[in-house]
Amino acid sequence: MRRFFALLCFVGLALSAVAQKSEDSKLSVDLYGFIRNEIFIDSYKGLDAANELFYLVPLYVGQDDNGADINEQYSSNLSAIASRLGVKVAGPEIFGAKTSGTIEFDFGGIVKTEPTLFRIRHANMVFDWEKTRLVVGQTWHPFWGGGAFPSVAGLNTGAPFQAFNRSPQIRYDLLAGDWTVSGAAVYENQYTSKCFDASNYSSPTQAQRNGVMPELVWSAEYKKSGLTVGAGAQIKRIKPRMTVTGTAGKFKAEEFLASTGFMAYLKHASDRFTITAKGYYGQNMTHLTFLGGYGVATRDEVTGEETYTNYTNYTTLLNMVYGRKWQAGVMLGYGGNLGTDAALYDEGSGKGIVTGLLPNVQDLARVAPNVALNVSKFRLVVEYEMTTANYGAGTFDFSDGLYADKHRATNHRCIAMMMYFF
């Protein structure tokens, strides 16, 4: 009840600010958002969030005594928690720049455990000097890729083949004609890098925070006459552990782990047809909702001191959409695990010491055709999404962190999504 009252107060304040617009010509406030409902049925339980609305990959957990996959079970849901409310503010000139800000909420909350809580999606301010721009606050990660993302029915918006991350950041854009060149310092919030001892501390973002330096991202985008071409690179540093333990006792950990990532994309949009192609390649990009991670490369048995090595993963996607009022579209995605950069430490268990987002998945693919109807402020999309993943099975290879055999898990999802914009 208190959350609902807070929401009403927020809406009331926003509407009050809109009413004051005529009294202060230097400030304008616009309310926007949509009501979204979606119903789906799955054939295989998956790695997911938000009451299974945000589905990544089928999650293989083993077989029963009859040899059947335990997670190969049907489930369904109807939910409105992806509905959204936002406020855009345009303010006075400050430091010679046009100023604006955005604050946007949805009901995603703690997406896995309490997905109906009110939460911040975007909260940022912008200083625009025409040829340069400064963005401070939480918004899409630069690897989201501007306007070049797949058009699908699912809330995952193409993840884990498309980067999905909103984070606090300081981004500086250089605007040169049809080009935008950007540099950003990014910190983590909801979408995080993994660490080995997260359960012992209060915040899951500690791996990146304890790495001290922010993630550094550089990107460039060219946009003209329906053509968009972009590329980017990033580097981050994390601290996998706070402490290590060996035969001589428990000690403060000193080791860090650095990783890099790259992206490239192309989009062409005409009157009725849009095509988007995108690719990502990098190490330990779990904070971008990609599969992968890292593992222990060496360990000193006396002090417990460790070094680490990254898994390298890649993803590609192709999205095509035809039509305006009635639209037909399809998204195709494929990704793979190229293994670790260095050999993993063998502690005698038969498997390496690894963490991340399903680093045992060897490759994955998705096919998602859909049909959409757009009428004024209304949009209806019906989609079939098939996602399949090959999990490592059999003998573990310590030289690269991969497996000798594979076990395939496949989910068939049927979804209908309805949106009303305002």
Model-found features: residue ranges?
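Outer-membrane beta-barrel proteins
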Residues: 42-46, 112-114, 145-149, 190-195, ...
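Membrane-spanning beta-strands of outer-membrane beta-barrel proteins
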Residues: 80, 118, 165, 213-215, ...
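Outer membrane beta-barrel
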Residues: 24-51, 57, 61-192, 212-213, ...
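C-terminal beta-signal and adjacent terminal beta-strands/loops
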Residues: 377-401
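Outer-membrane beta-barrel "beta-signal"
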Residues: 406-422
